[in-house]
Amino acid sequence: MDSKIIVALDYETEAEALSLVDQIDPSLCRLKVGKEMFTTLGTNFVKQLQERKFDVFLDLKFHDIPNTVARAVRSAADLGVWMVDLHASGGLRMMEEAKNILEPYGKDAPILIGVTVLTSMEDLDLLQIGINASPMEQVIRLAHLTQRAGLDGVVCSPQEVEILRKNLGSDFKLVTPGIRPVGSEFGDQRRVMTPSAAVRSGADYLVIGRPITQAENPAEVLRSINASLANI
């Protein structure tokens, strides 16, 4: 099955992460490796996940001068990851160079997505960095810029999914963190939604961490979430 679930691996050690990974089925999810784990464990950890047949979303949110970001994206492609992201606030030229460097990879290129507004940020957070707009307004602005640059989609909170789907079309990928199954705590995510509600709104992929990784039976939780999405 082509699962919509991306499990966020937020662990302090390789042993903890692989203990979880070895309990779940690669046909039921993809895996997200972020800054903490990648900085600690490097490319070898990604390769171990790939050897277990998991698609990997390399969530490093590149944001630098265009040439540097493009080369980093190329390195991610050489690593064979399924998806990689960058900050849309890095600008049009940065995103275009990142997209262009993937042309030689053809169908083997990773999905390239832009990060709009982090789901932990609220109006005051944006104002404090000089952005006089609501999170929704800034997300829409950056999502349009991302599409103009030719990227495959964006990361956005569940509340922005519906309006982005209407504005950006059916082929533009929407990757949604801030997903909490019914009964889960919100944690540090401020704009959240259940898996089924997010998919109904138009999300393509759902990033879920602690509700799965900290569950007593992660495999069962994963199966349950997939089942809840089966008929949507």
Curated annotation (Swiss-Prot):
<dbReference type="InterPro" id="IPR001754">
    <property type="entry name" value="OMPdeCOase_dom"/>
</dbReference>
<comment type="pathway">
    <text>Pyrimidine metabolism; UMP biosynthesis via de novo pathway; UMP from orotate: step 2/2.</text>
</comment>
<dbReference type="Pfam" id="PF00215">
    <property type="entry name" value="OMPdecase"/>
</dbReference>
<dbReference type="InterPro" id="IPR014732">
    <property type="entry name" value="OMPdecase"/>
</dbReference>
<dbReference type="GO" id="GO:0005829">
    <property type="term" value="C:cytosol"/>
</dbReference>
<feature type="binding site">
    <location>
        <position position="10"/>
    </location>
    <ligand>
        <name>substrate</name>
    </ligand>
</feature>
<feature type="active site" description="Proton donor">
    <location>
        <position position="61"/>
    </location>
</feature>
<keyword id="KW-0210">Decarboxylase</keyword>
<feature type="binding site">
    <location>
        <position position="210"/>
    </location>
    <ligand>
        <name>substrate</name>
    </ligand>
</feature>
<comment type="function">
    <text>Catalyzes the decarboxylation of orotidine 5'-monophosphate (OMP) to uridine 5'-monophosphate (UMP).</text>
</comment>
<dbReference type="InterPro" id="IPR047596">
    <property type="entry name" value="OMPdecase_bac"/>
</dbReference>
<keyword id="KW-0456">Lyase</keyword>
<keyword id="KW-0665">Pyrimidine biosynthesis</keyword>
<comment type="similarity">
    <text>Belongs to the OMP decarboxylase family. Type 1 subfamily.</text>
</comment>
<protein>
    <recommendedName>
        <fullName>Orotidine 5'-phosphate decarboxylase</fullName>
        <ecNumber>4.1.1.23</ecNumber>
    </recommendedName>
</protein>
<dbReference type="GO" id="GO:0006207">
    <property type="term" value="P:'de novo' pyrimidine nucleobase biosynthetic process"/>
</dbReference>
<feature type="binding site">
    <location>
        <position position="209"/>
    </location>
    <ligand>
        <name>substrate</name>
    </ligand>
</feature>
<dbReference type="InterPro" id="IPR018089">
    <property type="entry name" value="OMPdecase_AS"/>
</dbReference>
<dbReference type="InterPro" id="IPR011060">
    <property type="entry name" value="RibuloseP-bd_barrel"/>
</dbReference>
<feature type="binding site">
    <location>
        <position position="189"/>
    </location>
    <ligand>
        <name>substrate</name>
    </ligand>
</feature>
<feature type="binding site">
    <location>
        <position position="119"/>
    </location>
    <ligand>
        <name>substrate</name>
    </ligand>
</feature>
<dbReference type="InterPro" id="IPR013785">
    <property type="entry name" value="Aldolase_TIM"/>
</dbReference>
<feature type="binding site">
    <location>
        <begin position="59"/>
        <end position="68"/>
    </location>
    <ligand>
        <name>substrate</name>
    </ligand>
</feature>
<dbReference type="GO" id="GO:0044205">
    <property type="term" value="P:'de novo' UMP biosynthetic process"/>
</dbReference>
<feature type="binding site">
    <location>
        <position position="32"/>
    </location>
    <ligand>
        <name>substrate</name>
    </ligand>
</feature>
<feature type="binding site">
    <location>
        <position position="180"/>
    </location>
    <ligand>
        <name>substrate</name>
    </ligand>
</feature>
<dbReference type="GO" id="GO:0004590">
    <property type="term" value="F:orotidine-5'-phosphate decarboxylase activity"/>
</dbReference>
<comment type="subunit">
    <text>Homodimer.</text>
</comment>
